[in-house]
Amino acid sequence: MRNFFTLFFAAIFSLGALILAIVACAGSTKNYSPINKIYCAELDLSQMKVSTVLPSLSSATLSSLGLPSYINIGLWSYCTVDSSHNIQSCSSPHGIQNFNLSSLVYDNINNNEALELMDSVASVVLPEKLKSKMTYYNNLVKCMFITILIGIVLTFVNLVFNVLRWIIHIRPLTWFGAFFSFFAFAALLVSIGSCLGTYSYIKYILKHNYSDYGISMSIGRNYQGLMWGAVVGALLNFILWCSVRSRPTVIYANAPIEEKPLI
């Protein structure tokens, strides 16, 4: 009976972690609520100093360039947001959404005359720390992307072992269940850790250069909430798997010894 309740609650926590991680992974892939409100980080371009970031367009304004006020960055794509915080559109998912602030600014200029005055994306001027360590940031973004997918797959596999463990009472199933539950938890933890660390540092750089560039960043709360919920669910699932007995407890009763009558 103890194993029944242990596996039951482990399945609930595992399923909850799986659903939360999948929803977080799908954030900003479509312009539908609530998917479009789930993002890793939000770029605030509403106060961007055009004369500094785009020197060749120093006389232009943010509105004349057609730039969005905000850009929500997801794992697969990003969404553009206007000054009223209404989401205008979301880009099509195309694999890992690398962080490249220059490209995000350049690709969202909706003014052909302005684009003609710019040579290329290299015309966008940004803090040196962002440009010099771009490869490092994107390696962390790749880590975040790959580990969340690994976490989702391992959590699903763990659910399969949970179902099998209800039917077949053998030790290898318990061992494999605990094995996959641990690495699912570890993968999800690494994913949210790399996300928080990467974008927090970029936020720090932009904050210390805000007076020159007027660009800031905030961390996506919905994404953080979903992912930390998935991590907690995966951790509880692992703890429960560690308390699953390999085999049901069997109590052997010895038959009473028949006493022989004294002669």
UniProtKB/Swiss-Prot annotation:
Coiled-coil ranges from the UniProt annotation: none
GO biological process, one term: fungal-type cell wall organization
Subcellular location, record wording: Cell membrane
Glycosylation sites: 100, 209
Induction: By the HOG1 MAPK, cell wall perturbations, and nitrogen stress. Expression is controlled by the MSS11 pseudohyphal growth transcription factor.
Keyword tags: Cell membrane, Glycoprotein, Isopeptide bond, Membrane, Transmembrane, Transmembrane helix, Ubl conjugation
Record topological domains on the Extracellular side: 28-143, 194-223
Cross-link (Glycyl lysine isopeptide (Lys-Gly) (interchain with G-Cter in ubiquitin)): 260
Domain of life of the native organism: Eukaryota
Other known facts: Present with 1660 molecules/cell in log phase SD medium.
InterPro entries: Claudin_CS (IPR017974), SUR7/Rim9-like_fungi (IPR009571), SUR7_domain (IPR052413)
Family: Belongs to the SUR7 family.
Annotated Gene Ontology cellular component terms: cell cortex of cell tip; cell periphery; cellular bud; cytoplasm; endoplasmic reticulum; plasma membrane
UniProt PTM comment: N-glycosylated.
Membrane topology: Multi-pass membrane protein
Segments passing through the bilayer: 7-27, 144-164, 173-193, 224-244
Stretches assigned to the Cytoplasmic side: 1-6, 165-172, 245-263
Main localization, broad class: membrane
Biological role stated in the UniProt entry: Contributes to the wild-type cellular response to nitrogen stress through signaling pathways that regulate the expression of genes involved in amino acid biosynthesis. Required for wild-type filamentous growth, cell growth, and cell-cell adhesion.
Name the record gives this protein: Protein PUN1
